[in-house]
């Protein structure tokens, strides 16, 4: 039955009805507002999975993109690493596994939208974060709005655009959005300058993004680019080597984004909250219908890399728990970093791994070749257990995304917990404004409808079974439950004629609703 559902998923994903193999007769309109993305006015809850095309042999792209699609991924994200394509100044390589255009054509064939993370700085555990060594000899400050560095960035973007031209969303192509730089903490004007360069060259996409962490020194004007967030179950970059160090445990508790773990950085909405505070005072940009930015992620840890000094071993439950918690906390786009591992390409002058002997991003020593990341799909496309455990969640997001997207999160249990806190069950509710009754929202969702999210899991801690738990949403009390240790679930309330269920919705096909 699950195989039938997955086959059906691949045929019906709303985001993927754009292409017929050639330019689409009518390209769907993509907009955003304070809640979600909208495709032709319909709310969607996409699943974005990161794969680095230049870390995978070109002949394997089609097979691996299909696997991602079958896992429920509806948007591909990929970095364009500058030093993978211009390791030597002026010599651009778009051959073999570096051929961005060929990769985009594969995604178009598989009807998978693509978010390009353009750099110039990417990180991705690549040497110098992707910036070629020769750039460090130019005598300019990197990642700032000075003419020299912006001139280099423009040359890079022009080269990338030669690969993208004709494959943008407006052309019926797969490229739906672009991210500028990565994990930037400087002045917002630099990110805006990168966007203006891209627009001048010819980039014309439905939306643009940036990482919402760390906090910028000066803001980006509201509406220019969506801030996207993240969380990780563990991090190779920590200086300590003890298990459970840092604030990663926060990723396993329902909370507003400002309570996010961030792996040493606040990857929640610290910066986004500042943006949203300015929203009411800002002119409404095209595609924005008021309030604030939507809560999206681009770096929800699908696994974790290992460094020489710190080698976290993740469990399949880690990724599933974080994903469910983020969804229950109000996120309407789950973006995994990574969803598919890979292998560093060979360089001409240097190895391409992050290492302490490089002129930039030199805090950690990463493996020379492997970038498996313990992702749902590993370095060679092998499936790890969480590839399968995440699929039902992705099916749910696809089939009930339009119902879920306008629902706000509320938190009956405390948002601030200490590591290993086991005093009470962790749960959250998503409903329309948290109100009871039979009113409907503008999208037609009944205000008496809700989803109850439950997470009784935390990495490194065996949380106890919770007995006689009384869950309630929209005035409807569920029977008292016993929640086993490690249990993670989503219970519907007043959804599709179901008053409530102590089982999780998976999919609906041909008038039938499937639960597990």
Residue ranges and their predicted role:
Residues 1-10:
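Bacterial N-terminal signal peptides that target proteins for export
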Residues 15-23:
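C-terminal segment of classical bacterial N-terminal signal peptides
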Residues 24-75, 105:
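N-terminal carbohydrate-binding accessory modules
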Residues 47-52, 77-79, 115-119, 179-181, ...:
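A cross-family glycoside hydrolase active-site/sugar-binding cleft signature
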Residues 53-59, 85-86, 90-95, 184-188, ...:
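Acidic-and-aromatic substrate-binding clefts and catalytic sites of carbohydrate-active enzymes
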Residues 61-127, 199:
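Aromatic-lined substrate-binding rim segments of carbohydrate-active enzymes
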Residues 109-115, 122-272, 281-306, 328-331:
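Active-site region of glycoside hydrolase catalytic domains
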Residues 138, 149-163, 171-179, 188-195, ...:
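Carbohydrate-binding surfaces of carbohydrate-active enzymes
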């Amino acid at each position: 039955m699950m195989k039938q559902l997955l086959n059906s998923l691949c045929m019906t994903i709303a985001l993927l009805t754009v292409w017929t193999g050639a330019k689409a007769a009518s390209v769907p309109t993509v907009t955003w507002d304070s809640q979600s993305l909208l495709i032709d006015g319909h709310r969607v809850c996409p699943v974005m999975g990161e794969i680095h095309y230049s870390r995978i042999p070109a002949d394997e792209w089609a097979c691996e993109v299909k696997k991602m699609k079958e896992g429920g991924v509806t948007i591909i994200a990929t970095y364009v690493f500058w030093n993978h394509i211009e390791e030597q100044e002026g010599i651009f390589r778009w051959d073999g596994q570096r051929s961005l255009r060929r990769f985009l054509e594969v995604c178009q064939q598989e009807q998978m939208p693509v978010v390009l993370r353009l750099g110039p700085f990417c990180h991705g555990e690549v040497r110098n974060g992707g910036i070629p060594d020769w750039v460090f000899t130019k005598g300019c400050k990197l990642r700032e709005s000075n003419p020299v560095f912006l001139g280099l960035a423009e040359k890079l973007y022009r080269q990338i655009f030669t690969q993208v031209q004709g494959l943008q969303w407006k052309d019926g192509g797969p490229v739906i959005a672009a991210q500028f730089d990565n994990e930037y903490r400087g002045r917002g004007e630099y990110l805006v300058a990168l966007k203006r360069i891209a627009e001048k060259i010819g980039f014309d996409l439905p939306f643009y993004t940036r990482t919402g962490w760390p906090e910028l020194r000066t803001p980006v004007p509201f509406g220019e680019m969506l801030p996207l967030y993240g969380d990780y179950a563990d991090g190779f970059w920590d200086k300590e080597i003890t298990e459970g160090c840092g604030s990663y445990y926060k990723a396993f508790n329902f909370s507003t984004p400002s309570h996010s773990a961030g792996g040493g950085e606040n990857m929640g909405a610290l910066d986004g909250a500042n943006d949203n505070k300015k929203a009411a005072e800002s002119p409404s940009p095209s595609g924005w219908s008021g309030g604030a930015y939507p809560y999206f992620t681009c770096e929800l840890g699908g696994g974790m890399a290992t460094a020489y000094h710190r080698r976290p071993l993740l469990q399949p439950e880690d990724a599933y728990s974080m994903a469910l918690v983020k969804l229950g906390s109000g996120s309407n786009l789950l973006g995994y970093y990574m969803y598919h591992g890979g292998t560093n390409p060979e360089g001409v002058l240097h190895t391409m791994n992050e290492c302490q002997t490089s002129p930039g991003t030199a805090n950690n020593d990463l493996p020379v070749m492997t970038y498996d990341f313990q992702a749902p799909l590993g370095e060679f496309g092998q499936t790890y257990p969480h590839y399968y455990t995440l699929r039902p969640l992705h099916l749910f997001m696809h089939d009930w995304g339009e119902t879920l997207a306008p629902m706000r999160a509320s938190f009956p249990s405390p948002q601030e917990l200490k590591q290993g806190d086991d005093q009470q069950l962790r749960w959250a509710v998503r409903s329309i404004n948290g109100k009871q009754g039979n009113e409907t929202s503008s999208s037609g969702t009944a205000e008496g409808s809700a989803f109850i999210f439950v997470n009784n899991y935390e990495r490194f801690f065996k949380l106890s079974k919770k007995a006689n738990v009384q869950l309630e949403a929209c005035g409807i009390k569920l029977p008292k439950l016993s929640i086993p240790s490690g249990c993670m679930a989503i219970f519907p309330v007043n959804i599709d004629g179901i008053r409530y269920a102590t089982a999780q919705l998976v999919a609906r096909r041909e008038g039938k609703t499937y639960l597990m």
